[in-house]
């Protein structure tokens, strides 16, 4: 913590103790702008909660919602955003209302509720256009593109990303331009055009390095690593993941560090080095638990289960998958729950327990329908296949 931030923290403590809400709110906002980008989520939540003891404050609700969302607690986050929205609307702060709608949309997106996410983004967009927030408009267009990308509509995703790219270039938002180029690269990666993906990632890297956006550079390096991973160039993938990891550690982003370690573990799985993969996953798990990210914890436990399954240790695989399920349900991640139940079904199928595999797949298909998952058709086909296999007998 820098000396300046330490002084602000002490001023905030004294303002709360002295019942001086205006000072507490102003200082809390300043400190949150420093802490949120470096994953100091628990500290942001504590400070915002202290400020709120002095009365309702939209900014504190917003900051606390962000912190709670980032640490895997989507429902408390959504309640904070709801409170912030009420106050911003009462104050006529249309720009902040739009920002809050956009953040709430991101939470719903993380929960797998793509339609509700899209609804929030589409409500934010006209507000941003009304107040002339071109940079915010670009971010929201990017978010809308992200929904369409996940829904399996890459061309609609690209259309929104290109609109966002035009705006970021028009307003001179170099960091935003880099983010959008990265997102465009990811669409190309998803449709298998990996060389075009790498071209966009390299453009983004050039910009992030030019503007000194270390966090953005790390994100793009991670994406470059993922592209090389899909190309089968695992050594180059690991090299880029390690470059990202070095930056992430330098900026103190603990959640990002866990994500990078998780990515490295995934590459080791592809290389068949399963014990090294497990070492990376366990390092990531310790960090993600430290920062309190329940959704991230579930994702890493899921990968640990997958690694044990690859090792042929079905009992340990099932143990870890079953650790994942209550967390997925706790955070409301129905899409993630479907993924884990699918993994459980495959373990049971490999072990010859078709009855249990079918029961899990029935739940998978039901969850797929609830969230509009693009894997519904494939999962339904597998369920039919297993039912037919059971009917035919050994």
Kindly label every feature range from the protein language model.
Residues 5-8, 21, 41, 74, ...:
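TPR-repeat structural position
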Residues 51-60, 383-394:
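Alpha-helical linker/edge segments of TPR/alpha-solenoid repeat scaffolds
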Residues 1-71, 79-80, 87-90, 96:
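Extended alpha-helical scaffolding segments used for macromolecular assembly and cargo binding
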């Amino acid at each position: 913590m820098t000396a300046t931030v330490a002084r602000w923290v002490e001023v905030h403590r004294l303002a709360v103790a002295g019942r001086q809400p205006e000072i507490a709110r102003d200082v809390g906002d300043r400190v949150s702008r420093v802490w949120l980008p470096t994953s100091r989520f628990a500290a942001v939540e504590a400070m915002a909660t202290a400020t709120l003891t002095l009365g309702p404050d939209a900014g504190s609700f917003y900051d606390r919602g962000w912190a709670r969302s980032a640490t895997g607690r989507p429902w408390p986050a959504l309640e904070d955003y709801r409170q912030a929205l009420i106050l911003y609307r009462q104050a006529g702060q249309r720009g902040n209302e739009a920002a809050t709608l956009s953040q709430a949309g991101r939470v719903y997106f993380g929960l797998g509720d793509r339609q509700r996410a899209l609804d929030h983004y589409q409500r934010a967009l006209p507000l941003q256009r009304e107040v002339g927030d071109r940079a915010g408009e670009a971010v929201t267009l990017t978010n809308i593109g992200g929904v369409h990308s996940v829904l399996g509509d890459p061309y609609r995703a690209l259309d929104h990303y290109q609109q966002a790219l035009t705006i970021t270039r028009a307003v001179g938002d170099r960091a935003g331009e880099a983010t959008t180029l990265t997102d465009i690269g990811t669409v190309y990666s998803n449709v298998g055009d990996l060389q075009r993906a790498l071209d966009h990632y390299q453009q983004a890297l050039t910009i992030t390095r030019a503007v000194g956006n270390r966090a953005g550079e790390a994100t793009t390096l991670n994406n470059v690593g993922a592209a090389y991973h899909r190309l089968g160039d695992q050594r180059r993938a690991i090299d880029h993941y390690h470059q990202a990891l070095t930056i992430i550690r330098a900026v103190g982003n603990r959640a990002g560090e866990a994500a990078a370690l998780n990515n490295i573990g995934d590459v080791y799985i592809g290389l068949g080095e399963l014990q090294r993969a497990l070492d990376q996953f366990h390092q990531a798990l310790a960090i993600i638990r430290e920062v309190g990210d329940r959704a991230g914890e579930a994702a890493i436990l899921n990968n640990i289960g997958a690694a044990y399954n690859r090792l042929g240790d079905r009992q340990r695989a099932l143990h870890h998958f079953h650790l994942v399920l209550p967390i997925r349900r706790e955070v409301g991640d129905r899409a993630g729950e479907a993924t884990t139940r699918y993994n459980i079904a495959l373990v049971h199928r490999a072990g010859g327990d078709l009855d249990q595999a079918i029961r899990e797949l029935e739940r998978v298909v039901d969850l797929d329908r609830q969230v509009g998952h693009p894997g519904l058709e494939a999962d339904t086909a597998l369920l039919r296949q297993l039912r037919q296999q059971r009917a035919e007998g050994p």
